[in-house]
A protein has these predicted regions:
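Hydrophobic ligand-binding cavity/cleft-lining segments
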Residues: 1-46, 148
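A generic structural signal for beta-strand entry/edge sites
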Residues: 3, 48, 75-77, 99-103
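Short, surface-exposed coil-to-beta transition loops
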Residues: 3-5, 62-66, 87-92
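Structural motif
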Residues: 11, 72-74, 98
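Short, intrinsically disordered, mixed-charge
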Residues: 19-26, 124, 128, 139-143
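Glycine-rich portal/gate segments that line the openings of hydrophobic small-molecule binding cavities
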Residues: 38-84, 135-148
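Beta-strand/loop substructures that line and gate deep hydrophobic ligand-binding cavities in soluble
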Residues: 81-132, 137
Length: 148
């Protein structure tokens, strides 16, 4: 099994951070490798929202990585599952208030089956890199105008 997590302290309130991460259309603003993304069905910010996402894979080939929001608790938690593509991890964003800031933790979990278990080390490394992109998310959110 591959597991990775990372956390940052963002100088914004929990609802500002939550509203940003629950909208999958914001992903290209902070995650690298996203070629395209659109809301396929459901409502942005709600459980059941399904996003069609294409990533840049090895050699620049497109890779499907569609995902569905499985839990959306305002100001507290967003969970998702990848429903298309070669790897289908589950993940979540977990928020907690610290003074006037928000601690955001991003966790990914993937249980490869069959021959994919042979790639566990590569998958683990990729997931570690993915969650570490929270540093860019922090910079993007903190660059937004603070709400009054």
């Amino acid at each position: 099994m591959a597991f990775a997590e990372y956390e940052v302290l963002i100088a914004r309130d929990a609802m500002t951070v939550y509203d940003f991460v629950v909208d999958g259309l914001n992903n290209p603003l902070w995650r690298s490798g996203i070629r395209s993304i659109k809301l396929l069905s459901g409502t942005t910010g709600r459980k059941g929202a399904l996003y069609q996402q294409t990533l840049s894979g090895p050699g620049g080939r497109p890779i499907a990585a569609d995902f569905e929001i499985t839990e959306a608790r305002p100001g507290a938690e967003v969970r998702f599952v990848v429903v298309a593509g070669p790897a289908r991890p589950t993940g979540g964003y977990y928020l907690s208030t610290e003074g006037e800031a928000t601690r955001l933790r991003f966790a990914l979990r993937y249980e490869p089956k069959g021959l994919k278990r042979l790639l566990d080390g590569l998958i683990q490394s990729t997931m570690v890199d993915e969650v570490a992109q929270l540093e860019k998310l922090k910079a993007v959110i903190e660059a937004l105008p603070a709400s009054a």
